[in-house]
Amino acid sequence: MQNFEDLFTYQDGIFLTWMWNTLFYGIVGTAGMTLISVACGYGLAMYSFRGRGFLMGCIIGSFLVPGALLTIPSFLLYTDLRLIDTPTAIIVPSFFNAFSVYLAKVYAEGAIPHELLEAARIDGAGEYRIFFQVGVRLMSTGAATIFLLGFVGMWNSFFGPLVFLRSSEKWTVMLGLYSWLTVKHDQTVDLTGMVVVGSIISLIPMVVLMVSMQRFWRTGVSLGSLK
């Protein structure tokens, strides 16, 4: 119990700040990534246009580029834009995820019949209305999966915050707990015990998210059986 008390009081309760930061980065960044990925995947799956195959090849090819390879160019760019040590440096890059776009495209191809879109067009619906009222609803299970994978990635992010964030008040929970492990022995508290307790507490949002997403997957299975 002493570790729990120390965890929430050490350094003026900075652990709660790290938890809030990570939750904020995760929700905002993953929500933007999900919307962009679903829109791009829907467009690639439902529309035929010149260069679609080349564009899809570029998306798949980007899987081969190590994220660490882009660290220095990204750092220089963010420095020029004065984004270092700001939430923007963590949130905006998470909006664009090639794997999520690919996943959304594959799911849209199997979940959305072209005949349904044609029927909506005949009824006078515009493309934006079709996307939000038809496409998004039919892709809800895929969107939930993309959101879950993205949020878990953001929650466990370490390298990006380590490079782009300097102020400890803006760190994520993973980076903050790691910093406690690298601190010299503190005679007042048991930092190792606090890290263990903090790691356990940091799992709670993941469990809550997993449970809350169950209804989307159940809905997807039901729709699939009805088809």
Language-model features, listed with the residues they occupy:
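A structural signal for multi-pass alpha-helical bundles of membrane permease subunits
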Residues: 1-227
